[in-house]
From Swiss-Prot:
Pfam families: Cytidylate_kin2, UxaC. Keywords: Isomerase. One of its GO terms (biological process) is D-galacturonate catabolic process. It comes from Corynebacterium glutamicum (strain ATCC 13032 / DSM 20300 / JCM 1318 / BCRC 11384 / CCUG 27702 / LMG 3730 / NBRC 12168 / NCIMB 10025 / NRRL B-2784 / 534). Its EC number is 5.3.1.12. InterPro entries: Metal_Hydrolase, P-loop_NTPase, Uronate_isomerase. Belongs to the metallo-dependent hydrolases superfamily. Uronate isomerase family. This is Uronate isomerase. It catalyses: D-glucuronate = D-fructuronate; aldehydo-D-galacturonate = keto-D-tagaturonate.
Length: 518
């Protein structure tokens, strides 16, 4: 019987007993749900070929730069770990090296992850990792080799066992996405494998091969246009191609947060210099900043979610990159400034209601600024500043709360529900039978299971409010307005909210009849 902490049901849960109890219930609520992975680096071809993994080293060590860079920092040659296709050492010898250096991973997230793999995927006691002799390493290597040869450990079978529902890959804009299509057309494979548009190779002039790749992009997808116009057209076309193959997002690994746009003339000038190999480093970064801005612009048009992760010096070791290739663990973060860098992008696109979404917790505990020094900044309904983007957003906020039950708190919550000027605290009570019906419809649960889920959500919400904000959301006297949403139409509820705010703060709101400015 295993005694490894990796098998303990409370691993990683809080030490405080009361908080741990809440965490246990939260975990029980979600741990068996399907996996929806919006970002990853697996290849779609893995599931098309569905081949057995060759050996433990090729699967678990050589491609994992979190593992290899730790050993490299202790003097292990990456070639001995078979990184970048090097085969100086056998897979078995590389495994022995890993096992003999296991002490390096004590207390690290990487070590914890490997222990979880051993315990919960392979069924091997993780404590056996602590014995690093060659004989012991060989025994585990042979066990894993036998396990990986089983049909249950091929990519498709693992995807089903892990309850993988959606997996987003990361793909070059010129990828033909044939493997994604093959999977989408295969009725025997239930997970959805979606491509993600990753244009970094065409935005970073300072990377090797940029000019050749960019020329090919324009020639292939630019609709016959040249230069900067061809570049933009090619990107639009390939984004649409990805969307047609199921893509929902575009992923951008940025050098920094600069999003300053360039004029067409300046962009063309830098593009020409980049293709000729004469652009300065400052011009290269300006070009990348401009493309980030343009991709945000495109996201407003085609709906691809834009994800960015800036502030990492990729492939910091030039010698390691030359010998082993890119992405082998030589990435180093550097200090970032977000406010000024993202300002051009957010100034032009940040008010778009579809650009930034919020969490389900925020949909319950609203931090909507219901009121300020400006006229109609409350903007909660169509008869208040009908053309205001804030009006539309606050209207959606109220609709969410009406549908799900919960609380809307003005002026960043005013967390203690105190008498802060300009706030309005509202509680919506969604009838339990309606909530249960909604859960049954969305999840397919039975009525009893749906009712249990609603009850659990209510308990967790109340406990979270107590733990985080020291207040009881169930006490109606804490609110300016309490509404049973089953007794009124949505329009009536919005009107009541607006009227209540107008009565409480008559100087803050100007009622605009029929939604027209006067």
């Amino acid at each position: 019987m295993t005694t490894s902490h990796a098998s303990h049901p409370d691993r990683l849960l809080p030490a405080d007993p009361g908080t741990r109890d809440i965490a246990r219930r939260l975990l029980a609520h979600v741990e068996d749900l399907p996996i929806i992975s919006p970002h990853g680096h697996l290849e779609a071809s893995m599931f098309v070929k569905d081949e057995a993994f060759p050996d433990p080293t090729s699967l678990l060590i050589s491609p994992d730069h979190y593992l290899t860079r730790m050993m490299h920092s202790a003097g292990v040659d990456l070639a001995d770990l078979r990184v970048g296709g090097h085969e100086g050492k056998s897979a078995r010898e590389a495994w022995r090296i890993f096992m003999s250096h296991w002490d390096l991973y004590a207390g690290t997230a990487t070590g914890y992850w490997v222990e979880q793999e051993f315990e919960h995927v392979f069924g091997i006691n993780a404590e056996r990792l602590n014995v690093g002799t060659p004989e012991h390493a060989d025994a585990i290597f042979d066990e894993l080799t036998d396990i990986l040869a089983k049909p249950d450990f091929r990519p498709r079978a693992l995807a089903e066992q892990f309850n993988l529902e959606v997996l987003a890959t990361t793909d070059d804009p010129l990828d033909d996405l044939a493997d994604h299509k093959a999977l989408a057309d295969d009725p025997t494979f239930s997970p959805r494998v979606l491509p993600t548009f990753r244009p970094d190779a065409y935005t970073k002039m300072y990377n090797a091969g940029w000019a050749e790749k960019t020329t090919k992009l324009i020639d292939t997808a630019g609709d016959g246009k040249a230069g900067w116009e061809g570049y933009l057209q090619a990107m639009r076309n390939r984004r649409q191609y990805f969307i047609n193959h199921g893509a929902t997002s575009a992923d951008h690994g940025l050098h920094d947060t600069d999003t300053t746009p360039l004029s067409h003339k300046d962009a063309q000038k830098i593009l020409d210099k980049g293709l000729a190999g004469t652009a300065t480093l400052a011009e290269m970064h300006a070009f990348e900043a401009n493309t980030t801005y343009r991709f945000a612009e495109m996201s407003q048009e085609d709906g691809l979610v834009m994800t960015i992760h800036p502030g990492v010096y990729r492939n910091h070791s030039a010698s390691a990159q030359k010998k082993f290739g890119a992405d082998i663990g030589a990435d180093i973060p550097f200090q970032m400034e977000f406010t000024n860098g993202l300002r051009p992008l957010l100034s032009d696109f940040g008010e778009n209601k579809d650009l930034i979404s919020d969490s389900s917790f925020n949909r319950w505990l609203r931090t909507v600024s219901l009121g300020s020094t400006q006229d109609a900044d409350m903007a909660a309904a169509s008869n208040l500043a009908a053309n205001s983007k804030m009006a539309r957003q606050n209207t959606r906020d109220i609709l969410d709360a009406v549908s799900d039950g919960g609380v809307m708190l003005g002026r960043n919550g005013a967390l203690v529900l105190g008498p802060v000027v300009g706030t309005l605290h509202i509680k919506f009570i969604a009838p339990l039978n309606k909530r249960v019906e909604r859960v049954m419809y969305k999840t397919g649960l039975s009525e009893a299971a749906a009712a249990e889920q609603c009850a659990l959500e209510d308990r967790l919400r109340e406990e979270m409010a107590h733990a985080l904000y020291q207040w009881n959301p169930g006490r109606d006297e804490n609110y300016d307005l309490v509404i049973n949403t089953g007794s009124m139409t949505y329009e009536q509820i919005v009107d009541l909210v607006v009227e209540t705010y107008a009565r409480k703060y008559p100087l803050h709101v100007r009622i605009i009849p029929n939604g027209k400015d006067q």
